[in-house]
Amino acid sequence: MQQMVPASGYDRAITIFSPEGRLYQVEYAREAVRRGTTAVGIKCKDGVVLAVDRRITSKLIDVSSIEKIFQIDDHIVAATSGLVADARVLIDRARVEAQVNRISYGEAITVEALAKKICDIKQAYTHHGGARPFGLALLITGIDRHSARLFETDPSGALIEYKATAIGSGRPVAMEILEEKYDENMSVSEGMELAIYALSKTTEELKPENIDMAIVKDTGKLVEKITVFEIEKIVKKVYDKIKVENEEAEKKKATENIE
């Protein structure tokens, strides 16, 4: 009878499958993403929205130095969750790929083509010895011609297009909110509110200065970073809405108790 090798014997090399068909190093890389900051992406009728809770852990940190949303090209932007150093490497590579496409073909790269190139790089690091998978997920979004695109990539190199999605530690909660409240006909303004609402449910206190947000509208097709002043107004509006929801829930509960 063949002796089974313990799981620990399969998690030391990226190129070895376990008897159950698992690549443990890829699963560990996904765990790094699950511990990362929460990012939300939403496709709207007139553009796309990305929002990230930067999760500042110390008041001594200069908030402006923590970047979670990166412009790749004029019309493409990406949000990251996971290992910051890994994100920097892939973002730099994505920017190079975007410029190479412009030089080679005389036109901007599409969101889908860029997402696939990044996934090719990620996938290559799952079957080469002497390297480890990238411990991060990316939300890559932008405008292709006249349509919004939103892609999620994970450490294995898998690529999925979404209407709305979330990555990071708050993904389960954020996805529940998005599935309940997302509407394909919502505007970018409404999408920004929904993104902030989803982020607010993943943390005890959501501070405007800790939020990184960007949009791309289908009119100008250019990436636009949202200022803290604008985010403050959205956060206030969202918390006012949450307050009303809580009051209505309490009234409903009180009525049910009386009955």
Swiss-Prot record:
GO molecular function, one term: threonine-type endopeptidase activity
Compartments reported by the entry: Cytoplasm
Activity modulation: The formation of the proteasomal ATPase PAN-20S proteasome complex, via the docking of the C-termini of PAN into the intersubunit pockets in the alpha-rings, triggers opening of the gate for substrate entry. Interconversion between the open-gate and close-gate conformations leads to a dynamic regulation of the 20S proteasome proteolysis activity.
Keyword terms of this UniProt record: Cytoplasm, Proteasome
Disulphide bonds in the chain: none
GO CC list: cytoplasm; proteasome core complex, alpha-subunit complex
Residue ranges that the Swiss-Prot or TrEMBL entry lists as coiled coil: none
GO biological process: proteasomal protein catabolic process; ubiquitin-dependent protein catabolic process
InterPro entries in alphabetical order: Ntn_hydrolases_N, Proteasome_alpha, Proteasome_alpha-type, Proteasome_asu_arc, Proteasome_asu_N, Proteasome_sua/b
Function: Component of the proteasome core, a large protease complex with broad specificity involved in protein degradation.
Recorded family membership: Belongs to the peptidase T1A family.
Subunit structure: The 20S proteasome core is composed of 14 alpha and 14 beta subunits that assemble into four stacked heptameric rings, resulting in a barrel-shaped structure. The two inner rings, each composed of seven catalytic beta subunits, are sandwiched by two outer rings, each composed of seven alpha subunits. The catalytic chamber with the active sites is on the inside of the barrel. Has a gated structure, the ends of the cylinder being occluded by the N-termini of the alpha-subunits. Is capped at one or both ends by the proteasome regulatory ATPase, PAN.
UniProt cross-references to NCBIfam families, sorted A to Z: arc_protsome_A, PRK03996.1
Entry protein name: Proteasome subunit alpha
